[in-house]
Amino acid sequence: MSAMERLLDFAERTRLIETEDRAYARNCLLEAMRLDAPEENANAEAPLGDTMTEALNALCDDAVRRGVINDTGESRDLFSAKLAGCVTPSPYEVRARFFEKYRRSPEKATKWFYQMCRDADYIKVDRIRKNARFFAEGLEITINLSKPEKDPRDIANALKSKAAGYPKCMLCVENPGYAGRPGFPARQNHRMIPLNLNGESWHMQYSPYLYYNEH
């Protein structure tokens, strides 16, 4: 089974997409990979575990080999978000599912949204697992190893690029769906939940690197 089909299997299993969406999502992935048709006669591989990271990495490797993207950390991250975005529910659908669950249980709705962000690879589960943690009575010390170091080539590209001023910030409401650019992360797999708090409009979102539990 190809990395693309394993990714689609994972997305279907975690309900990021429905069975009826599979062909559409595949075509979105093919466009991103600059392929005309799916790979045939791929070697059999085990299904993905609890994240889509392995399949995304394999697709990025293939994209590098074929010259679709550069082999830098930032290029891979931008491309991974683009691929993950192909199997992430639309902002409207995410909000609809959240508030349907919220009417029955706000706690369950929040847990669902958190899990969806993990499944869609917005929360970088595999990277977070690399963090070093030390515990003492009433204290937890974390050494953050999950956020990748900047590649000098990526730093040079960011210096060459013009400041766009959009989105206004990395936490602003314009981010979901944004393709990213040198120095600014891609957000195709990012989703927010709108909330009304004391008569004001706010949005709930998670951090990709979870500096503390469900942050």
Model-found features: residue ranges?
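Active-site microenvironments that recognize anionic phosphate/pyrophosphate groups
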Residues: M1-E214
